[in-house]
C-alpha cells in the first residue's frame, strides 16, 4: 500500500468513512431490534408499508428514468433498500439553503443591453435565439454577452504561461475554484504569485472540492493558506455524517482576475494537466480564456458556490464591477449546471442536446467518459441518421478501467447509426468540448456522463460565431489525425467485459 493511501486512511477522511459505516450499521441494527420488539404481523405490515411508500416516492419523483430504475432495484433489497434510499436517495433543501437560493436569484449581474443582444440574435437566427432563451431560463446566473475576446488553448501546457502572466496583472481580486489541486510545478508557481498579490493588497479567494483534493492535499491545508492571507475553503466538506450531498461535488474550474479576465476548461491545478507529470500517457486537455464582459458570469458563478458553501459573503456589490468591453466578435454565455434542487433543470445536458439536435453538417465531441442516458443517446443517433457527421473521441488509455468498459459499451448502438467513434491513442483525453457546423461550440468541465450531467456542479462557455471556433476545429482535426477510429465490424469486447458492462450499466446513474 502506498504512503498516500496510508495517509488517507489515517486522516479525517478515513475516520469519517469509518464513522459513516458505523452510522449505517447502527441504522440497520435499530431496524432489526424494532423488528424483534413488535409482533410478526405488525413487523410485516410496517415492512410492506415502507416498501410501498418508498417505491411510490421513487416512481413519482422528478428524476431521469434510468435513475428511477436503479433506485427501484435498490429499493427491493430486503431491509437495506428503503434505508439506503432514505439516506441517499433524495436531497432536500434546508431552510437556510432555501433562503440562500432566493438571495442568489435576486442578485442582478445581468447586462443592461442583454435584451437588445438577444433581439439582435433573434434576427440572425431564430433557432440560436431559442437556444439562448433556453439557457438563460435554466440558469439565472447566465447571460448573453458580446464585447468579449476569447482565446482557445488546445493544451494545458499552452494555457499555463498566459495564466501566470494574467495573475501577475491582478489589481483588486482573484477568485479560484477547482476540483483538484496538488502541490507541484503548476500549483506552486500559481501560489507564489498569489502570495505576492496578497502582500500588494489583492483579495484572493480559493474554493476547492474536499473529496477531489482528499488524496492530494493535507486536511489542514486551508488553515495554512488562511494564515498566509488567502481566504481558502473546502467545498462540501467531509464530516462524519451520512448525507446525500456527498454525491454533489464541485467539479468546476474557474479562475477570475479583477472581474475582467477569466479562465475555464478541463484542467485542474496539478502537474499532469500541463504534462509535467506523466499519467496515462499524454494528457490532452483544453481551456478558454475570456477577456471582457462575459467574465461577469464567471464571477457570479464563483460567488454562487462561495455563498452556497460559506453561507454569507461581505458585499456582492464590490465584485459587481463594470468590466471593460473588449473588441471581439461573437456571442458568449458562460453558464453553470448542478444538482437538483439547486438547479431545477439539467442545464449541461440541455445545452448539449440543443447543439446536437440543431446541427446540419457536423458535430464533434471529446469526452473522457461516455455514460449517457437514453435521451442523449437517441439524440446523437438521430443526428447521424439524418446525415450529420457525428464524431466522438474518448481516451485510449483510461484513468478508470471499469469506467472505460462502460464507455466502450456505448459504442455499438452509436456506431450502428453511423456515429464515428475515435480513441485518442497518445494517452488520456480529458477535454470536454463540442463543436458544430463551424458556428457554435461549448468548452468547459461537463463530461458526457451522469456525474457531470446530473450530480456535480459544473460550468462551461457557450460560444457562437467566435473567431476561436476555427482553432477548436483545427484542434479536432489534429485529434482525429492521432486517434484510432473504432470500426463496428472489428469492435469486440470479451465476455467478462460484457458482463461487467451489463452489471455496471444498471448503476450507471451513480457512476
Task: Give a label for each model feature.
Residues 2-41, 115-511:
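Charged, low-complexity intrinsically disordered terminal segments
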Residues 46-117:
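Transmembrane alpha-helices and immediately adjacent membrane-cytoplasm interface residues
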Amino acid at each position: 500500500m502506498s504512503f498516500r493511501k496510508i495517509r488517507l486512511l489515517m486522516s479525517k477522511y478515513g475516520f469519517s468513512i469509518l464513522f459513516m459505516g458505523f452510522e449505517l450499521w447502527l441504522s440497520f441494527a435499530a431496524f432489526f431490534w424494532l423488528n424483534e420488539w413488535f409482533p410478526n404481523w405488525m413487523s410485516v405490515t410496517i415492512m410492506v408499508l415502507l416498501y410501498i411508500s418508498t417505491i411510490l416516492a421513487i416512481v413519482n419523483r422528478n428524476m431521469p428514468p434510468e435513475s428511477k430504475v436503479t433506485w427501484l432495484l435498490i429499493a427491493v433489497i430486503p431491509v437495506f433498500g428503503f434505508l439506503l434510499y432514505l439516506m441517499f436517495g433524495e436531497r432536500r433543501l434546508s431552510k437556510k439553503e432555501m433562503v440562500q437560493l432566493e438571495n442568489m436569484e435576486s442578485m442582478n449581474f445581468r447586462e443592461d443591453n442583454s435584451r437588445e443582444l438577444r433581439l439582435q440574435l433573434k434576427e440572425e437566427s431564430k433557432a440560436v435565439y431559442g437556444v439562448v432563451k433556453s439557457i438563460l431560463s435554466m440558469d439565472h446566473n447566465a447571460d448573453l454577452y458580446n464585447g468579449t475576446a476569447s482565446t482557445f488553448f488546445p493544451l494545458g501546457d499552452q494555457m499555463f504561461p498566459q495564466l501566470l502572466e494574467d495573475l501577475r496583472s491582478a489589481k483588486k481580486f482573484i477568485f479560484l475554484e477547482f476540483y483538484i489541486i496538488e502541490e507541484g510545478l503548476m500549483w506552486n508557481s500559481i501560489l507564489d504569485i498569489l502570495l505576492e498579490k496578497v502582500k500588494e493588497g489583492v483579495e484572493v479567494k480559493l474554493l476547492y472540492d474536499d473529496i477531489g483534493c482528499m488524496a492530494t492535499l493535507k486536511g489542514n491545508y486551508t488553515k495554512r493558506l488562511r494564515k498566509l492571507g488567502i481566504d481558502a475553503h473546502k467545498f462540501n466538506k467531509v464530516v462524519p455524517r451520512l448525507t446525500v450531498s456527498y454525491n454533489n461535488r464541485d467539479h468546476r474550474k474557474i479562475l477570475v482576475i479583477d472581474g475582467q479576465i477569466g479562465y475555464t476548461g478541463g484542467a485542474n491545478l496539478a502537474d499532469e494537466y500541463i504534462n509535467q507529470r506523466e499519467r496515462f500517457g499524454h494528457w490532452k486537455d483544453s481551456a478558454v480564456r475570456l477577456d471582457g464582459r462575459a467574465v461577469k458570469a464567471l464571477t457570479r458563478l464563483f460567488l454562487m458556490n462561495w455563498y452556497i458553501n460559506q453561507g454569507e459573503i461581505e458585499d456582492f456589490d464590490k465584485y459587481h464591477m463594470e468590466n471593460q468591453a473588449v473588441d471581439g466578435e461573437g456571442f458568449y454565455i458562460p453558464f453553470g449546471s448542478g444538482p437538483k434542487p439547486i438547479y431545477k433543470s439539467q442545464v449541461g445536458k440541455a445545452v448539449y442536446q440543443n447543439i446536437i439536435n440543431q446541427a446540419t453538417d457536423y458535430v464533434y465531441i471529446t469526452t473522457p467518459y461516455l455514460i449517457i442516458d437514453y435521451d442523449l443517446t437517441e439524440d446523437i443517433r438521430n443526428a447521424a441518421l439524418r446525415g450529420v457527421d457525428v464524431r466522438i473521441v474518448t481516451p485510449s488509455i483510461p484513468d478508470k478501467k471499469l469506467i472505460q468498459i462502460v464507455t466502450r459499451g456505448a459504442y455499438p448502438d452509436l456506431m450502428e447509426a453511423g456515429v464515428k467513434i475515435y480513441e485518442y491513442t497518445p494517452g488520456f483525453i480529458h477535454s470536454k468540448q463540442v463543436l458544430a457546423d463551424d458556428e457554435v461550440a461549448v468548452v468547459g468541465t461537463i463530461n458526457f456522463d451522469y456525474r457531470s450531467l446530473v450530480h456535480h456542479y459544473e460550468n462551461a462557455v457557450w460560444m457562437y460565431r467566435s473567431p476561436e471556433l476555427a482553432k477548436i476545429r483545427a484542434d479536432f482535426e489534429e485529434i482525429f489525425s492521432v486517434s484510432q477510429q473504432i470500426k463496428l465490424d472489428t469492435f469486440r469486447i470479451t465476455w467478462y467485459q460484457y458482463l461487467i458492462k451489463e452489471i455496471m450499466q444498471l448503476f450507471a446513474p451513480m457512476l
